[in-house]
Amino acid sequence: MKFPASVLASVFLFVAETMAALYLSSTYRSAGDRMWQALTLFFSLMPCTLVQLTLLFVHRDLSRDRPLVLLMHLLQLGPLYRCCEVFCIYCQSDQNEEPYVSITKKRQMPKDGLSEEVEKEVGQSEGKLFTHRSAFSRASVIQAFLGSAPQLTLQLYITVLEQNITTGRFIMVLSLLSIVYGALRCNILAIKIKYDEYEVKVKPLAYVCIFLWRSFEIATRVIVLVLFTSVLKIWVVVVILVNFFSFFLYPWILFWNSGSPFPENIEKALTRVGTTIVLGFLTLLYAGINMFCWSAVQLKIDNPELISKSQNWYRLLIYYMMRFVENSVLLLLWFFFKTDIYMYVCAPLLILQLLIGYCTSILFMLVFYQFFHPCKKLFSSSVSESFSACLRCVCWSSARRKSTEPVGRIDTDLKACTDQGAQPSTSKLTPEATEIWTAVDLCST
């Protein structure tokens, strides 16, 4: 049975980040900074509450008689209790006989164009561990993008304003680790959801590549937002609201345009109001993820599983192009409106470093999809093929514009030859004209 390392990592980041935030809020209270204290506590306690609700919802404990579990979640200690429960199940799994065994069927990755279906016995303990891993993965994503991301942005903004790095703020680098880990779990969840019928095995190099990709992407995004906020405090509200509502409303707009009925089968115990609340929370999380990085999971409300399983390279390309343009514009505005606190900062060099950092994240993303994606054999087209097709399209369009004038000369020669009753000779034409004449000849046949 696989060691529950992901559960341990999720609980460690949850506890460490919460303790660091509480310590930092106490330092703000001692210094008399009530506003910073309130915001730090809010971005710490709000995701804690959402994590407790997520664990209760996934395990369906609200409809079961488990008062101790409910009490631990009310005390914000639910993840610790669940972690102890996970390791108890793991340690006792080899000692007790499984009273119930289910059989799952998974297809292996294709080899030489063939894919075999493999049956696997899953015991009761392994099934419970799978549920715990799934719950903690979702909790890590919620904690990362609804708590850690705004918390890291806030603390970095305070550091820039006060030009002082305290011990508490340095400890908040845990927030960056939490965001990167949440994005990594989001990638793994997306792969397992899209390729649910296959046996997916993620190699260590794939984890390293995703970690580097997400680290560069999220770090540069947070720094860009902080720099822009430090000089244009009012306009950053506009930027955040436009980003948030664009991604929040996008799944709903697609749902309304599809004309599909309202989804009723998300959870049998939920009413229509409860389903609406769950969908609203999912779109809120979807918008929060896309605010800082690319969401590997694409929300699709008209789908019974709420997740789109198609691999849309064009949506990925458009997202990173628009995000790169947005980051560049925000950095240029910061450069023109920067204040005296950046007197000793080489602004052009900083802008160049941030843009190179974002391009580095895109490079690691392309490397992951090209070489380390566990299901790359199932892609209809690889990253390199899509990139080559895009380059060919650009080159073809530019060549077509350049060959407009030779085409005119060809038409004149053809008309003259036709009037004389002679066959045109391609040897007198330029190479470009010869290619075009061949294409015309083929099309006419």
From Swiss-Prot:
Membrane topology, as annotated: Multi-pass membrane protein
Gene Ontology molecular function, alphabetical: protein-macromolecule adaptor activity
InterPro entries xref list: XK-rel (IPR018629), XK-related_adapter (IPR051773)
UniProt modified residues of type Phosphoserine: S115
Keywords: Amino-acid transport, Disulfide bond, Endoplasmic reticulum, Membrane, Phosphoprotein, Transmembrane, Transmembrane helix, Transport
Residues in the Extracellular compartment per record: 24-37, 90-140, 192-207, 256-276, 338-348
Stretches that traverse the bilayer: 3-23, 38-58, 69-89, 141-161, 171-191, 208-228, 235-255, 277-297, 317-337, 349-369
GO BP terms in the entry: amino acid transport; intracellular calcium ion homeostasis; intracellular magnesium ion homeostasis; myelination; regulation of axon diameter; regulation of cell size; skeletal muscle fiber development
Chief location category: endoplasmic reticulum
Cellular localization per UniProt: Endoplasmic reticulum membrane
Gene Ontology cellular-component terms listed: endoplasmic reticulum membrane; plasma membrane
Protein family according to the UniProt entry: Belongs to the XK family.
Functional note: Recruits the lipid transfer protein VPS13A from lipid droplets to the endoplasmic reticulum (ER) membrane.
UniProt subunit comment: Heterodimer with Kell; disulfide-linked. Interacts with VPS13A.
UniProt-recorded name of the protein: Endoplasmic reticulum membrane adapter protein XK
Originating organism: Rattus norvegicus
